[in-house]
Amino acid sequence: MTGCLTIAGLGPGSSDHITPAVEQAIAVATDVVGYIRYVARIAPRDGLVLHPSDNRVEADRARHALDMAAAGRRVLVVSSGDPGVFAMAAAVYEVLETDPTRWQDVDITVLPGITAMLAAAARVGAPLGHDFCVINLSDNLKPWAMIEQRLRLALQADFAMAFYNPRSKSRPEGFRKTMQILKSFGEGNRPVIFARAVSTPDESIMIVPLAEAQPDMADMQTVVLVGSSQTRTLSHKGAVLAYTPRSVKG
């Protein structure tokens, strides 16, 4: 008997951000596979086996999930945010392509989730209200030269930007270089949003002009949003908000 594999996003952190479809997938799963921190968000119950694993073993995790599904289990692979954004959905399909006949009978479903990027944007207004791009600043899976090229092109195109994985203890230089490149374009009044641990008890959100933004304002739990030249800030009921207008004059 062949089981099924569901790849689901748990949202940015709060259980309030988990979609009903994902809640249903959790309820019927026999096995949950994922990074330790994400599997810890799943409540144990009878009939459910949890398979937490360390970071950077995405391919092994995907292979294990596919094999269990092929053996008849109802397997749920979990990611934070959305599983298709720098997460496990791509890892599963990468592994599937290496040996498609091995798992040809497994039904695979991807269930979307609310990303940290969109949750952060919602907290401060609508900074991604016009064209924007998303860049993963980790150079674990791609060269820094590619990241820098994409960053410069995004600035030339005047996109608002969202940065994932901006800074870690092992590679603080990448985000420092990113800030230097951003500031080299000379628009120091662009709003920069540092959104850490969005929707969790440890949430902190800060909006500063680009000229005042510092690399140590971010860590690996932070999503950084940078406005375009059109992004504005305003005060409303004592809070500073940011938004990018829907129209741009030619």
Q: What name fits each language-model region?
A:
Residues V85-A157:
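Class I SAM-dependent methyltransferase SAM-binding "motif I" and its flanking Rossmann-like core
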Residues M1-I108, Q214:
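Class I S-adenosyl-L-methionine
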Residues R73-S79, A126-L137, Q156-F159, A211-M220:
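A polyampholytic, Gly/Pro-enriched intrinsically disordered region
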Residues L66, A122-V124, E148-R152, I181-K183, ...:
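A generic local secondary-structure boundary/capping motif
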Residues A21-A25, A43-P44, V92-V95, G125, ...:
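Short, solvent-exposed amphipathic alpha-helical segments in soluble enzyme
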Residues L10-S14, Y35-R37, S53-R56, S80-D82, ...:
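Fold-independent oxyanion-binding glycine-rich loops
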Residues L5-I7, Q156-G250:
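A contiguous loop/helix-start segment that scaffolds small-molecule binding in enzyme catalytic cores
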